[in-house]
Amino acid sequence: MILSQGTSPLKGDFSRIKFSIASPESILAHSRGEVLKPETINYRTFKPERDGLMCEKIFGPTKDWECYCGKYKRVRYKGIICDRCGVEVTTKSVRRERMGHISLAVPVVHTWFFRSVPSKIGALLDLSTKELERIIYYEVYVVINPGEPGEKQGIKKLDRLTEEQYFQIITEYEDNQDLDDHDPNKFVAKMGGEAIHMLLKNIDLDETAVHLRTVLRESNSEQKRTDALKRLKVVESFRKSYEPHKKSRKKPNALFAEDDMPEPYVYEGNKPEYMVMEVIPVIPPELRPLVPLEGGRFATSDLNDLYRRVIIRNNRLKKLIDIRAPEVILRNEKRMLQEAVDALFDNSRKANAVKTGESNRPLKSLSDALKGKQGRFRQNLLGKRVDYSGRSVIVVGPELKLHECGLPKSMAIELFQPFVIRRLVDRGIAKSVKSAKKLIDRKDPVVWDVLEKVIDGRPVMLNRAPTLHRLGIQAFQPHLVEGKAIQIHPLVCTAFNADFDGDQMAVHIPLSQEAQLEASLLMLSAHNLILPQSGKPVTVPSQDMVLGMYYLTKSRGGEMGEGRIFYSAEEVRIAYNEQLVGLHAQIFMRYDGQVDQKFDAIRVMETFVEPTSEKAAWLRKQLDEKRMVLTTVGRVIFNQHVPESIGFINRVIDKKVAKELIGRLSSEVGNVETAKFLDNIKEVGFHYAMKGGLSVGLSDAIVPETKAKHIKNAQRDSTKVVKEYNRGTLTDNERYNQIVDVWQKTSNIVAEESYQKLKRDREGFNPLYMMLDSGARGSREQVRQLTGMRGLIARPQKSMSGQPGEIIENPIISNLKEGLTVLEYFISTHGARKGLSDTSLKTADAGYLTRRLHDVAQDVIVTIDDCGTTRGLYVHRNIEEETSGQIKFREKIKGRVAARDIVDTVTGNVLVQAGEIITEELADSIQETAGVEEAEIRSVLTCESKVGICSKCYGTNLSVHQLVEIGEAVGVIAAQSIGEPGTQLTLRTFHQGGAAQGGISETETKAFCDGQVQFEDVKTVAHTAMNEDGMEDVRTIVIQKNGKINIIDSESGKLLKRYMLPHGAHLACEDGVLVKKDQVLFRSEPNSTQIIAELPGTIKFADIEKGVTYKEEVDPQTGFSQHTIINWRTKLRATETREPRLLILDENGEVRKTYPVPIKSNLYVEDGQKVLPGDILAKVPRNLDRVGGDITAGLPKVTELFEARIPTDPAIVSEIDGYVSFGAQRRSSKEIKVKNDFGEEKVYYVQVGKHVLANEGDEVKAGDPLTDGAVSPQDILRIQGPNAVQQYLVNEIQKVYQINAGVEINDKHLEVIVRQMLQKVRIEEPGDTDLLPGDLIDRSAFIEANRAISEKVRISERGDAPARIQENQLHKLRDITKLNRELRKNSKKMVAYEPALQATSHPVLLGITSAALQTESVISAASFQETTKVLTDAAVAGKVDYLVGLKENVIVGKLIPAGTGLKKYKTIKLVGEESAPAPVVVEAVVSHEAEASPMVEEEVAE
């Protein structure tokens, strides 16, 4: 591979790297000499052998400034080549860069190009890998030129011949051997690398390309076209590798400085024959070291062994050729040489890999050195070890300020030693470096003073592994502490995900001035208070601090000093200190500022002040006029730390309130004030947690007395269910679901009662309740298990794919306070163990997801301010989502730029103008405005920047609440924001001890709020049935599939909530009535889908035959039978077919309605039975997802969405709007037709047994599913286009994070990733561009290719044009017009032309793995996965990596092109204000001194 870097050698600055196949000339140009012997070093002297693999003459001296024989020593002989031993006198570091070579006796094929899929050599020669292998490994001859003998025998070029056939021709035509090799009449056939070399050399790439394009255009055979396309891709790759170099002939060399280059060579692009090697490069010896161990043994790199085998076999082959050995022996030796070279380049590909002697492991070849986690890319280039760093255990430092950390003295002195030594010498305390070191070793007191001065104002960086997001590394101001542990501030623990049970952290020292500046300005912990993933604060008090603040601000009736009136906060403080009022006493205080409270002060006041008294009247007036506030002593103390501009916080401070408050502070008063506030409330929190002395005893867990009664009721209900099952009215599935339901409800009732009991205990001062209510520790779920009942337990799942685990139907009735019986204990161990094993297994999955996300988005950087697009994304107000606790409308538009004016449709007011940022205040007002149903916002998904994205489309940077700056690496932030909670999700299970949560299948649906009922698409029938008491009961039953009930505001008509009506639901309300909150709207059966009669008539079974399409299951306990439809295909012959369905006949026996019955349905009617509208004909059981809060279902779901996988058993989706009709029934499928009014018809074949959602005559829209199953994102893209699929992916991923884990991620981050998944298009028709059909290319490259030919025309008739103009060529329109003018002037025939045909394409949705591999950057893709494949393809095509992403720049050791590393900052120089000269002079200053200071203060000339 050749590295190229534009215009200057690698040691300077380079802007791109070109990959290509190394020609023999380039290998020789890099080489310093030929390695002739397999020896490495002399076993006695330990010095390298001459001409061996470690030879000093070739690779340079092993000691600095000393030749091999010792004739020249010392630096003064620099550059002299010793006349005795031939070694150049130079530094030993050249042994890291000087290469050698091995000249092979016969050409050898490079295994990468032969074994890669598809095989590059195979594609060029049109040979299969199997056939190639037989030629390369000397099994058959291949015909290179058939000549006359071949023609007579009917042998064509590339035919394979066995040895017998070959010798037969040779003996038959003896004079053939005398002809010259280039004579077209000579018969030539060879084998091995030599044959391949000759064949490849004879290929005319241009001719092959033309031929293959013709086949593509004209062939009717699909197979031929596929093969031609496969070959054409490789041919075009080789042709492309020439293109950029037609102008420049000389090519600078990457591996040497110019004065160091052995001999220039001209780079011509890749030639096919370069894939066969005549010389092999030998890498520098320092990169394959040989290290002496004790006891006279050596540790050596595997590469030395592999090179030795090549050299030994090569030398032996040369000798055999010299002595004219028999062909059989030669052939065997040549094959062994080929195998040795294969092993050297890629040992892992081979079935019989070369193994080591002792441990019998395969040797690590050159490819293995690059591949995988331990390979060069990931181990050494992306993850380097750093000096000036240390690590230690962390402990809490409660007295630290937010921006400080405690650094142990012993660690600090070690880290800052060079700086301390310099200070000691400068101040004259120590005479020399050596004596300064002695002072430090003695731990002289003066050293500590100097150290204090050195670290003053120098930030250090702390990092805790795993670093899942950018808050995992933060900068702090160090404080010297005794001991050996690092101290950290309690509030930064959340960001680091640290606790003090033995966690360790690493310390890094930023050395340069620029690094210190960035650390203290950008990375200081006090500047990182907001989570980039959601814009919410991360430095939130937790545990003791929350408990302390909650205890402090809670009120209690009857405390000492209740109802007293105070003049000011100071007065309250004095009274409290003098013990005249209690901490929780309700008092009145003069305050005329803004008050944040959520209670009615006058009503509370009347509970402890006589309402009719004069005092009460006066207080009422004061409270009304907002001149006084009713509060508690504790809240007054708390508010002394709140900045005045925020007002008086008159609420109980729990974790949620604290989080809101910190969020408000950071946006309203800035980070400095917020950091002060945080430090203050930390002190307050800890202090009052101590004052309260809150601890939990066994007596604090109170079990409600009513528990026994509820359990008795539940046991009664479950017995009733079992009885019904025994009577045969329920299936086993329904029995199970109903029993689980009964216990789930009981469990929830008991939990609620125990919670309420705790709440009432000691006026809410029960320590357990306070911990729970404040959010300090524990959850309602845990309280339920302590004082209620443990409830139902999930069975552990077998599969990892996230199928729901069954729930054990016998609940655990005891709670943890009462203690479990042996059986209960045994059942509950299930969940506990599963939690632990899950945690360890899933962390790896989440980590891998994060890695793929990083790789796909690492080059998304904000590059420009505005891309100027007119497109935007429509965000709708979705009532269902908002009321079910998902992301609100305001959250979706907050921090975005409006694409169009947002107008209140009721008043016509413009709320936000196009191009304006929607701030938090604006978003709130839009949320409250009923007249705004949707808003069009700028989005990353519609951004049209060519490279990266623009800041207007991204919107605000969530962590600073301002428009994102140019240079922000938003891709990496997006990947971190999605990956970090992914790891959190994983660790979700074990807190519940495996207790089952999830759907109580609610059979009654109640109104969410007061309002008016409005039916939408509701079709019903009245149905009379017997109720449990034997009385007649008339019910209204829904018979339409997609009906809805809306609840609207009766005055404004605004939609408040929407409910989907299930098929077969019983309505409990009427259209247009007013309902109250929690009034029942409808009842439905949650565990099955019902098939309901819509008309009266008689049932007839069609294709429902016992033992064929249904089985009769007689329940052994009850003796009742149940008819279940079965998969009948297993019972019938291949030609037969069945379609089970129920028919409703009228009196004349005519069919009025047909109902297909899917497999697994249970029939509820008999053949010939009379039915009425609303009768249940059959039930199709649903699989209910009743698993505990286990994200197992979540993580695979997220992965499936990001990888754009087609779900198992996807739904069939209609491609057009139209009406459904059913067609013919085949053996294994039935036809569904969708036809529209324009006569367009689409036919779909549905597998028998799949549940069809659409009925005959139903109207469907494009994109509606016709059958059950998950919709495939690929279908959405095909039918509804890229916008729909982008929205679908973002919403679905959000749902998983929201519902499964309650994690908030801003849509922006998901949009960035989804944008990357849709960056590519697939070429349909290439037109006149040089693209290939089926090519996958970047959308911008596609637009560019079309733009390039937009001004060109294709010549259809050349007329009397000059010879350079031929038919079917492309030329610029203006050139041809000019030429035609000339031709017309000379009365000649003009050129006829037509416009060049543009290419057409369709968008492609790639999963994140393939999107990361398809990236434009070779280096980035190679370091991600499939390293050899990526590099092989890049080398063949002569690809250039322009180093635009972050990863490739890290790998080549440059600053990343983001943040302060942006290119435009390189040429900026800081100039003092008074001395700033005219701009021209500044430019001169800049260009001369640009090297000196890479840091930026002020932008001057670019």
Curated annotation (Swiss-Prot):
Key words, A-Z: DNA-directed RNA polymerase, Magnesium, Metal-binding, Nucleotidyltransferase, Transcription, Transferase, Zinc
Cofactor: Mg(2+); Zn(2+)
Cellular component, GO annotation: DNA-directed RNA polymerase complex
InterPro entries xref list: DNA-dir_RpoC_beta_prime, DNA-dir_RpoC_beta_prime_bact, RNA_pol_asu, RNA_pol_N, RNA_pol_Rpb1_1, RNA_pol_Rpb1_3, RNA_pol_Rpb1_3_sf, RNA_pol_Rpb1_4
GO BP annotations, alphabetical order: DNA-templated transcription
Top-level taxon of origin: Bacteria
Reaction(s) the record says it catalyses: RNA(n) + a ribonucleoside 5'-triphosphate = RNA(n+1) + diphosphate
List of residues binding Zn(2+) 2: 867, 943, 950, 953
GO molecular function: DNA binding; DNA-directed RNA polymerase activity; magnesium ion binding; zinc ion binding
Residues spanning the membrane: none
E.C. code: 2.7.7.6
Binding site for Mg(2+): 499, 501, 503
Annotated source species: Chlorobium chlorochromatii (strain CaD3)
Cofactor binding note of this UniProt entry: Binds 1 Mg(2+) ion per subunit. Binds 2 Zn(2+) ions per subunit.
Quaternary data: The RNAP catalytic core consists of 2 alpha, 1 beta, 1 beta' and 1 omega subunit. When a sigma factor is associated with the core the holoenzyme is formed, which can initiate transcription.
UniProt function note: DNA-dependent RNA polymerase catalyzes the transcription of DNA into RNA using the four ribonucleoside triphosphates as substrates.
Family: Belongs to the RNA polymerase beta' chain family.
NCBIfam families attached to this UniProt entry: rpoC_TIGR (TIGR02386)
SUPFAM superfamilies hit by this protein: beta and beta-prime subunits of DNA dependent RNA-polymerase
Sequence positions that bind Zn(2+) 1: 67, 69, 82, 85
The protein's name: DNA-directed RNA polymerase subunit beta'
